[in-house]
Curated annotation (Swiss-Prot):
Its EC number(s): 4.1.1.130
Membrane topology: Peripheral membrane protein
Record: residues binding Zn(2+): 170-171, 174, 186
Assembly mode: Component of a multi-subunit COQ enzyme complex.
Protein species of origin: Drosophila pseudoobscura pseudoobscura
Protein name: Ubiquinone biosynthesis protein COQ4 homolog, mitochondrial
Length: 267
């Protein structure tokens, strides 16, 4: 288990009170520990927005209210994840170091977007492979892996990578669960992610997203989607340590069986 280092609180007299006031740590070379950081971590420290504890509390409260009022505000949901998810991310970090696959992810820090994935190759794979299923999911739902917001408010660069990884793997989780991106599918996936990762933002998205379902959707949610999501979320293996990029050629149903995933019966 990694040793966790906590920063001493900033004296109250030195804390800014305006949320809009922030500073960026732009010079990594001045940090004596920078030599031990990899490329992702050094770049993150250049772009990270530093905020005080008070500002973090305000951002967490404000983003949670905005996300409840309008679940389509992905910027607010992203902000909520960064300002409330640190403890859960440390737990995920422990999980990553419990497997060889997770350890390699933390060392290599792979990224998922159109400049890193050979989508033409994935399109050429047999239809029953995970890679082909992923490409089909993107096309069917008209989504792109380049749409994820960058992490900015987490202090620890390793935790920032974990949050980045979670965001970039979201569509892969949709794929392996065979869930679309409509409201029902998103709420169901959020329940699975919440139970699997412990991230508060996932619980929030699952609970408050369900409130906005229409009557017909809510009946299907309570009868089919919610029981299925709770069962899978509790029984499946941790998803964050899965090196998805090494599973493109794997049979998608074999991958589901390996992870302990049961698909929702179509009705």
């Amino acid at each position: 288990m990694m040793q966790r280092c906590w920063r001493l609180p900033v004296p109250l007299g030195k804390r800014g009170l305006a949320v809009v006031t922030h500073t960026r740590q732009a010079v990594v070379s001045d940090n004596p520990e920078a030599e031990n950081l990899d490329g992702f971590e050094q770049q993150y420290l250049k772009e990270r927005i530093e905020i005080t504890t008070f500002q973090r509390m305000l951002l967490g409260a404000g983003s949670s209210i905005a996300a409840i009022l309008d679940p389509r505000r992905h910027d607010m949901i992203a902000c909520l994840g960064e300002t409330t998810g640190e403890d859960a991310l440390w737990n995920i970090m422990d999980t990553m170091h419990e497997s060889e696959e997770g350890q390699r992810i933390m060392v290599e820090k792979p990224r998922i977007h159109t400049s890193t994935i050979d989508f033409k190759r994935l399109e050429s794979l047999p239809a029953d492979t995970f890679g082909a299923a992923y490409v089909k999911f993107l096309k069917d739902n008209k989504v792109t892996p380049d749409s994820r917001m960058a992490v900015r408010f987490l202090e620890d660069p390793k935790l920032a990578y974990l949050m980045t990884r979670y965001r970039e793997c979201h569509d892969l989780i949709h794929t392996v669960l065979d869930m679309p991106t409509n409201m029902l599918g998103e709420v169901a996936v959020k329940w699975v992610e919440a139970l699997n990762t412990g991230l508060p933002m996932c619980y929030g998205g699952a609970v408050f997203g369900a409130v906005r379902l229409r009557p017909k959707q809510r009946r299907a949610y309570l009868k089919h989607y919610l029981p299925w999501a709770l069962e899978n979320g509790k029984q499946m293996k941790p998803l964050m340590p899965v090196y998805w990029e090494e599973r493109w050629e794997q049979n998608v149903n074999e991958l589901r069986a390996e992870l302990g995933i049961k698909l929702l019966n179509k009705f």
